[in-house]
Each structure stands twice: as structure tokens, then as C-alpha cells.
């Protein structure tokens, strides 16, 4: 009888250890693949500030609420950014739209390697960061997916001209573009070679969405003057409800819009 008790106790112990081991396999891991890309974002709305460099993580799986969060922990060792995927966090208040869980992680400029850890699986990437762009290359990937190998950064003292029109007034786009080109204090430029451009590349939601154009200035006052230039142009050339919009997006988070002018 005593011998049977010992056997039963041993079996219970083995089952408990087995359950404990299986539970540990799911601690600090998630079950969905991850898309990611570097981004430059701002902390405030339309307040002048330099953009902060982040790594944006997006789950491939979509959830019932748009504001699910991807919880991570991270550390830096010898210029290597190590990111551990912990769990998907359910929000207290649900924003009722289906969407992925997301997370933004600080991306220091000294980093030259990124490591993702999901349970017992490890993905790694090399990364090069300079003032012009961020370049990322795969070393080994299993559950993570890089959206863009090359990502341009916001050039200092730059802005984007973004405009959309109706089909019968497309000339307004060209007219304001000429205003910008004729300004001796502004220089048009292009993002050379391949890479994701941080500015909107076209307008959105118009009958005609024109390609964006990019300019740089040497004196910030010249950029500030664009507010009144756009205001005057809009009053003289854009009719209300004509389906035309013009926006100026500055690299420092300041923007001007025609619909706030006319």
C-alpha cells in the first residue's frame, strides 16, 4: 500500500512538472506573425518638434477592437536592440473597428542589429541608420516580416506639397506648384533611389489625386510665409465645395491647409 502511495505521488509530481513546462512555453510569446518598419513620428499635433525615430510593430492578425496593443520588453546590448514579444493586451475601452495590435519602440541611431524573440524563436536583422535613410536587411526571419528595406527620413528644412482636385479644375494643382517653383527661397528636390518616403506621396479621396512635390528652404521664416501665401491663393482660386484641397506638410510637424484658409 505504501509502495502504491509513492507511485501515485511520483505520477502527480511528473504531471505537475509537465504542466508547468507547457505553461512556460507560452509565457512571453504571441501566436501571430508581425509586420514591422521604421517610422518617424511626433508626440503632439501641429506643434513644431523634431520627429522621433521609432520601430512600428503591427500584428498580421486582426482583432475585434482597433486599439489592441502589442506588449513588448526591450533592451540594448552592444548596439543590438533586443525586442521580446510578451502578449497582446486587450483595451479597457474598445474602439469598435477591426484592426491589428500595434506597438512603437524607440529606435536609437547607434543600433546596428535588431533581434526579435518570440518564445523560443529568434529573428534577426542588420540595420544601418544615417541622416538620409534607414536600411534594414534580413539575417534570419521566421515570424517577423520587414515591410520596407529602405526608409527615407524627413530631410531637415523640408516640406511636401500635397494636392487633390476635381476632374474639371486640375489646373489649380499646377498653378500653386508654379507659385512654389517661382519662389527663389525654395528649392524643389526628389527622394533619390528606392525607399519608402515619409511624406504622403499623393493626396487621398479626390477625383484626381496628384503626385506630391517636395521642397527645401534655408530660412524658417520662408516656410512660415507659406501660410499666408496659401491663404491668399485659396481665397482667389479655390471655390467652396469644388473638390480641391492643398496641404503643406513640414518636416517639423507644422502643416497648412487650404480648407482652413478660404
PLM region spans:
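Bacterial Sec-dependent N-terminal signal peptides
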Residues: 1-4, 12-38, 262
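Acidic/polar, low-complexity intrinsically disordered N-terminal segments immediately downstream
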Residues: 22-86, 141-164
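A mature extracytoplasmic/lumenal domain signature
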Residues: 59, 85-89, 118-120, 129-131
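Solvent-exposed serine/threonine-rich low-complexity stretches and specific carbohydrate-binding patches
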Residues: 80-92, 193-204
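An anionic, turn-rich surface loop/hairpin at beta-sheet edges
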Residues: 85-109, 209, 215-230
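A short tyrosine-centered beta-strand micro-motif
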Residues: 110-121
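Surface-exposed beta-loop interaction hotspot
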Residues: 124-180
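Preference for solvent-exposed, low-hydrophobicity sequence contexts
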Residues: 180-186, 190-262
Amino acid at each position: 500500500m505504501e509502495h502504491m502511495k509513492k507511485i501515485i505521488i511520483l505520477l502527480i509530481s511528473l504531471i505537475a512538472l509537465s504542466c508547468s513546462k507547457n505553461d512556460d512555453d507560452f509565457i512571453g510569446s504571441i501566436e501571430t506573425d508581425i509586420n514591422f518598419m521604421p517610422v518617424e513620428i511626433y508626440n503632439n499635433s501641429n506643434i513644431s518638434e523634431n520627429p522621433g525615430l521609432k520601430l512600428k510593430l503591427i500584428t498580421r492578425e486582426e482583432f475585434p477592437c482597433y486599439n489592441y496593443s502589442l506588449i513588448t520588453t526591450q533592451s540594448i546590448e552592444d548596439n543590438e536592440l533586443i525586442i521580446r514579444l510578451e502578449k497582446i493586451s486587450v483595451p479597457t475601452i474598445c474602439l469598435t473597428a477591426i484592426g491589428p495590435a500595434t506597438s512603437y519602440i524607440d529606435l536609437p541611431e547607434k543600433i546596428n542589429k535588431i533581434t526579435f524573440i518570440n518564445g523560443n524563436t529568434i529573428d534577426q536583422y542588420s540595420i544601418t541608420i544615417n541622416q538620409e535613410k534607414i536600411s534594414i536587411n534580413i539575417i534570419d526571419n521566421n515570424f517577423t516580416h520587414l515591410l520596407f528595406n529602405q526608409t527615407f527620413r524627413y530631410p531637415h528644412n523640408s516640406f511636401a506639397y500635397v494636392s487633390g482636385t476635381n476632374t474639371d479644375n486640375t489646373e489649380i494643382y499646377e498653378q500653386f506648384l508654379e507659385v512654389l517653383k517661382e519662389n527663389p527661397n525654395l528649392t524643389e528636390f526628389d527622394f533619390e533611389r528606392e525607399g519608402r518616403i515619409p511624406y504622403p506621396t499623393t493626396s487621398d479621396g479626390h477625383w484626381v489625386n496628384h503626385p506630391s512635390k517636395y521642397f527645401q528652404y534655408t530660412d524658417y521664416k520662408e516656410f512660415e510665409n507659406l501660410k499666408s501665401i496659401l491663404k491668399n491663393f485659396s481665397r482667389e482660386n479655390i471655390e467652396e465645395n469644388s473638390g480641391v484641397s492643398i496641404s503643406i506638410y513640414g518636416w517639423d510637424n507644422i502643416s497648412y491647409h487650404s480648407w482652413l484658409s478660404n
